[in-house]
Amino acid sequence: MQWDIVIGLEIHVQLATQTKIFSGSSTAYGAEPNTQANAVDLAMPGTLPVPNEQAFRYAVMFGLATNAEIGRRSVFERKNYFYPDLPKGYQTTQLAQPIVGPGYVDIDLADGSTKRVRIHHAHLEEDAGKSLHEDYHGMTGIDLNRAGTPLIEVVTEPDMTSAEEAVAFAKKLHSIVTSLGICDGDMSQGSMRFDVNISLKPKGSDTLGTRTETKNLNSFRFMEQAIAHEVERQMDILEDGGVIVQETRLYNGDRDESRSMRTKEEANDYRYFPCPDLLPVEIDDAFIEDARSRLPELPDARRARFKEQYGLNDYDAGILSADAKLAAFFEETVEHGKDAKLAANWIQGEFSARLNAEEKSVAEAPITGAQLGAMVTRIADNTLSSAGAKKVFEALWTGENNDVDAIIEAKGLKQVSDTGALESMVDEVLAGMPDQVAQYQNEEDPKKRKKMLGGFMGPLMKASKGQGNPKLFNEILVRKLGG
């Protein structure tokens, strides 16, 4: 039987506020366990929550950026359940009247098409603490530093039909929240966590199948793997005549396997009721307009500008505009390097490869946009060859020297572009390769002739000690060999 895949996402976005959603405790990452949890976070008797205005502002900014309705009246409820890292015995969240209503995000797919994914709603809530299982001799430690950290939980409609679409949406959302500055987007620190709801239905059927939820995926790669794994698992069960159990599952990316955590609860299992400690929050026009005035350039607008302003193709503009820090680095490079296409090639090539290899962010790169721009300028004005540029880049990256011209001078990398000198080298090399010259001139196939030119370039680069301008060498060769 053929199946349709149905996917919806729940994405927890940790807001980049300085303090927690209902207390004054710091949200800084990496502190010693239980050093950033005050009496409110610990649910001590007599404590009362005080809402964090910045969390509401960030939520409204998110709603505006995702074409969503803003809930003018926002209400908090208590979601009741027991877990060791939830000291109150309930989570303060939103259900009936969330701060962000229906919206949508358009995603770009590999085949060049665009798809609209609807957002059902996004609500504010507090994060739980963290259970620590290592170094406790068979016991579990509880760190409540994270308890009370503000989250937006984004809930999509089940509009996605493949892992590709789900990952594309997750990447687009990551791009939006980091561009807004409301989340640092560091998934290794739990700043964004993805829950994937998956079900299968017979191809063409309108009746949805039973869904499962795979929780706490913290990378795009794991999300893709988890979806593929769960789809295959459900197909195997259904095709063997079995029944899918509605449950929450945990995926292990290292082993490519999942296990059941618990039977999936319904909303009434959590006994939601309005939080008596928090009044409804009224969002007025002035607050919304203030949030709107704080919106930066968003990824789609930045992409369009990069295409128009710098003449980039759609692919390059998409890659360079998706990440706000990478976009800023690109623009700094172009400011100092002038040639936008050349700058784009180096950033997407050598620069990004080194970042990935060393697991660094753009902010941690040991080279600045100004330095890369200076190098791009020297490539564009034919001072540097591609091979020489790689040596300059290496010197910049390792901190050997931070001045491009000084590196070129010290390493003798200045490219020879004097046509008289280059012609003399070409004449000398051709004189020493009469058989190859004759073979080239007797060849009628243009493609083969073009390929045969490469046989002359090696000796020419050797004669010029690697400093001859390859483009000029090629032009001189074609002219002297007769086309």
From Swiss-Prot:
Pfam families: GatB_N, GatB_Yqey. It comes from the Bacteria. Gene3D superfamilies: 1.10.10.410, GatB domain, N-terminal subdomain. The keyword Nucleotide-binding applies. Keywords: ATP-binding, Ligase, Nucleotide-binding, Protein biosynthesis. The keyword Protein biosynthesis applies. Allows the formation of correctly charged Asn-tRNA(Asn) or Gln-tRNA(Gln) through the transamidation of misacylated Asp-tRNA(Asn) or Glu-tRNA(Gln) in organisms which lack either or both of asparaginyl-tRNA or glutaminyl-tRNA synthetases. The reaction takes place in the presence of glutamine and ATP through an activated phospho-Asp-tRNA(Asn) or phospho-Glu-tRNA(Gln). Heterotrimer of A, B and C subunits. This is Aspartyl/glutamyl-tRNA(Asn/Gln) amidotransferase subunit B.
